[in-house]
Amino acid sequence: MSPPIKTVAVLVANPALSSILSMTLAGASSLRVRPFDTQLALMTYLHLAPADLVVADFDSVPSRADRLAEDLRGDRAITSRDLQIIALASALTAETKMASIHAGIDEIIMKPMSPRYLVERVLARLAKKKTLRPERRALRRTDWSRFGDNVVPLFRHEPAL
């Protein structure tokens, strides 16, 4: 039985780089590649069909990888919740690192890179499951009385004697 085919969306600044990456990724038999010219086209596609991974570019002026990742993570209409994002960057600065962490980018690959290296990283990223971040919840008040008299509440407001 063949492994399921995974969908990879590619959105980079340079059309030549986009075609090279798309052609190289399409060489892997387990990948279906969808290149996009604009962020709007990518978002529209993701509303209609799920993708497993997005390759984005930090050098893309209209849609930087961190802004794209924030939009993808914040959009509840996108069907795939475990969407992974790989960003391509020509320079890795502290600002780029912080923006990537804040936006939820899973991996950064430095340009120039070998297209084969990108294929290896995409396949490795798709092979392991994405760990979903826990949802933030409000603090619960715990009733410690069920543990008996041995539990001493440290932060209970007691009237002064």
Task: Give the predicted meaning of each segment.
Residues 2-16, 21-25, 35, 54-55:
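Conserved acidic segment of CheY-like receiver
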Residues 128-161:
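CheY-like receiver
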Residues 30-38, 45:
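Short hydrophobic/Thr-rich beta-strand motif most characteristic of the beta2 strand and flanking loop
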Residues 113-122:
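C-terminal output helix
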